[in-house]
Curated annotation (Swiss-Prot):
<keyword id="KW-0997">Cell inner membrane</keyword>
<keyword id="KW-1133">Transmembrane helix</keyword>
<dbReference type="InterPro" id="IPR036765">
    <property type="entry name" value="ZipA_FtsZ-bd_C_sf"/>
</dbReference>
<keyword id="KW-0132">Cell division</keyword>
<feature type="topological domain" description="Periplasmic">
    <location>
        <begin position="1"/>
        <end position="6"/>
    </location>
</feature>
<comment type="similarity">
    <text>Belongs to the ZipA family.</text>
</comment>
<comment type="function">
    <text>Essential cell division protein that stabilizes the FtsZ protofilaments by cross-linking them and that serves as a cytoplasmic membrane anchor for the Z ring. Also required for the recruitment to the septal ring of downstream cell division proteins.</text>
</comment>
<dbReference type="GO" id="GO:0005886">
    <property type="term" value="C:plasma membrane"/>
</dbReference>
<dbReference type="GO" id="GO:0032153">
    <property type="term" value="C:cell division site"/>
</dbReference>
<feature type="transmembrane region" description="Helical">
    <location>
        <begin position="7"/>
        <end position="27"/>
    </location>
</feature>
<keyword id="KW-0131">Cell cycle</keyword>
<keyword id="KW-1003">Cell membrane</keyword>
<dbReference type="GO" id="GO:0043093">
    <property type="term" value="P:FtsZ-dependent cytokinesis"/>
</dbReference>
<keyword id="KW-0812">Transmembrane</keyword>
<comment type="subunit">
    <text>Interacts with FtsZ via their C-terminal domains.</text>
</comment>
<dbReference type="InterPro" id="IPR007449">
    <property type="entry name" value="ZipA_FtsZ-bd_C"/>
</dbReference>
<keyword id="KW-0472">Membrane</keyword>
């Protein structure tokens, strides 16, 4: 590379010298005319006599200040000679431009080749960074895949107690019943009954009757249910505004899901609320007046099934 640079420098120096020599030669080429004129003037002066006239009787040329008109006429002479000086100069620039372009091209090439290793030197650094990142990214992926494996075995463990509880209920051993009936000469209106049931979180479902579930949203196991006291004991929620009945019956089977005492308390409070909203009367399972002693009897029946 150093030898190539030296050769290029020598070529550039030779080109510059050639341009300078050509310029001086062009200038010298135009000087003989003036020089000849000057020499002829000197010869003519030697041939002139004491009065200033030559052999032909012509006197010496005198320099007179030029008038504006003469100055204007003299200017074109100068301009006419100007292209003679400009033309060789233009040729000099054309000659100087050719080697200058070549020198620039050759100087750019080593700069490109010198920069190439800089990029290649950075490439392995990037590869090493990616190589170190791969195992770091792989570790959380493995953990994310193992996480569901750890959770999966817990699902049957949660379901097993529910299956055991379902099997433990078996056949109903007792049924707790409450009646809400209308007063004499009146009926319970379906238009008033439906909003009351929705407020108490009842949901229309199986057997075309209303049910109270574990969740207030109407999901989960059924705690107790409510049917129409008049046969066939069903409801039509689409025609509740035209519906009327003598009464409704709330019932809960034992054993039941969850806390039986808590479920009975919810059922009893719901029956009281329906009776108050619709102007009805609360009765026990035998359609007798609901008393405190009747309540204690129901509680004992619940404890007997515990």
């Amino acid at each position: 590379m150093e030898n190539l640079q030296l050769v290029l420098l020598l070529i550039g120096a030779i080109a510059i010298i050639a341009v300078l020599v050509h310029g001086f030669w062009s200038i010298r080429k135009q000087q003989p005319k003036g020089y000849k004129q000057g020499s002829m003037v000197g010869i003519n002066r030697e041939r002139r006599d004491a009065e200033g006239f030559d052999n032909d009787g012509i006197g010496e040329v005198r320099v007179v200040k030029s008038t504006p008109a003469e100055a204007e006429t003299s200017k074109p002479d100068v301009n006419e000679q100007a292209p003679q000086f400009i033309e060789p100069v233009e040729e000099a620039f054309e000659l100087s431009q050719a080697p200058a372009i070549k020198v620039n091209k050759t100087r750019v090439e080593p700069s490109l080749s010198a920069e190439a290793p800089a990029f290649t030197a950075e490439a392995p650094v990037q590869e090493s960074l990616f190589a170190t990142d791969e195992p770091l990214l792989a570790e959380p992926v493995i953990e994310a895949r193992q996480a569901p494996l750890d959770v999966a075995p817990q699902e049957p463990v949660v379901d097993e107690p529910k299956q055991v509880a379902t099997e433990a209920l078996g056949e109903p051993q007792d049924v707790l019943v409450l009646h809400v009936v209308a007063k004499e000469g009146k009926e319970l209106s379906g238009a008033e009954l439906l909003p009351c049931l929705l407020t108490l979180n009842f949901k229309f479902g199986d057997l075309n009757i209303f049910h109270r579930h574990e969740d207030n949203a109407g999901t989960g196991k059924v705690l107790f249910s409510m049917a129409n006291m008049v046969k066939p004991g069903v409801f039509d929620p689409d025609n509740m505004e035209q519906f009327s009945t003598q009464g409704v019956v709330l019932f809960m089977t034992l054993p039941c899901y969850g806390d039986a005492l808590m479920n009975f308390s919810i059922m009893l409070n719901s029956a009281h609320q329906i009776a108050d909203d619709l102007g009805g009367v609360l009765l026990d399972g035998g359609r007798d007046e609901w008393l405190e002693s009747t309540k204690q009897n129901y509680i004992q029946r619940i404890r007997a099934q515990a």
